[in-house]
């Protein structure tokens, strides 16, 4: 297992145009000891797609799920089973890394098992909508992690010798948080990079923002709450359960109120809707 290489996992489902930006963002990293693992989940030959754009590199690896729409969790697990490097990073095919992300993550991984990053939330034209989790670098516990990183979590990097897991293929949403919950069985903290080093693209057709997302989110969050109540995760930090349950309960309340809030304020981001509720809880 390589002690320096960071393997970047990119599941690919109908992203022939968008994936170019994702792969180019890894190519532009100041830290060059990386691999990219593209997992086709739509029978597309992404090696050919990227090659047509001049993206040919021995550090690129390609796998296929053998299905159409098996899901990002299936694709990521396929890569996790194949990768031999110690460090793994997650990158959705419609997102990008800022050039210094892997260097900052690698430096932090010398002392910490998991690294997260502030997000630069963007529209489909790569215009900034807002930042999430920006500020100083800080050490987060499982109990308070989601009160800082209140949006998506598919920007983490982790050390597989200190914590590892596979994605839960039974969940439609919240799979990144659920993976973290597994990692927290042995990892007590997350080192959060306060500089927004990860571009998170908001697309209407994505699993996080598309039609029916509220219903899927509610089901997945409810499932995670049930697991917490049953002691499913046996966290290394005993305080994790209470903090995560608080976040999920607040998030479920936000889901219930979001349709009315969106009707009053068209275009309202869920993050902008949720954040004041989290702050009120933290201040109570």
Please report, for each region that a protein language model flagged, where it lies by residue:
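Conserved donor NDP-sugar-binding/catalytic core segment of glycosyltransferases
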Residues: 100-129
């Amino acid at each position: 297992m390589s002690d320096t290489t960071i393997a970047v996992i990119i599941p690919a489902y109908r992203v022939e145009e968008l994936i170019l930006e994702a792969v180019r963002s890894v190519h532009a990293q100041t830290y060059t000891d990386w691999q990219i693992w593209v997992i086709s989940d739509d029978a597309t030959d992404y090696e050919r797609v990227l090659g047509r754009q001049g993206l040919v590199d021995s550090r690129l690896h390609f796998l296929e799920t053998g299905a159409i729409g098996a899901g990002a969790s299936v694709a990521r697990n396929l890569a996790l089973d194949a990768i031999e490097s110690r460090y793994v990073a997650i990158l959705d095919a419609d997102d990008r890394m800022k050039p210094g992300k892997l260097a900052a993550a690698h430096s932090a991984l010398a002392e910490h098992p998991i690294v997260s990053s502030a997000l630069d939330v963007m529209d489909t034209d790569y215009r900034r909508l807002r930042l999430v989790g920006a500020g100083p670098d800080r050490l987060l516990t499982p109990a308070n992690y989601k009160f800082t990183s209140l949006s998506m979590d598919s920007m983490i990097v982790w050390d597989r010798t200190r914590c590892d897991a596979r994605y839960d293929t039974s969940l439609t949403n919240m799979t990144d948080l659920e993976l973290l919950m597994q990692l927290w069985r042995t990892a007590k903290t997350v080192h959060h990079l306060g500089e927004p080093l990860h571009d998170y693209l908001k697309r209407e057709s994505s699993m996080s923002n598309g039609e029916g997302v509220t219903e899927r989110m509610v089901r997945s969050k409810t499932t995670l709450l049930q697991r917490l109540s049953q002691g499913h995760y046996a966290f290394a930090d005993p305080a994790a359960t209470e903090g995560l349950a608080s976040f999920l309960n607040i998030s479920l309340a936000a889901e219930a109120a979001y349709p009315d809030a969106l009707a009053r304020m068209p275009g309202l981001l869920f993050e902008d809707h949720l954040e004041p509720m989290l702050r009120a809880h933290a201040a109570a």
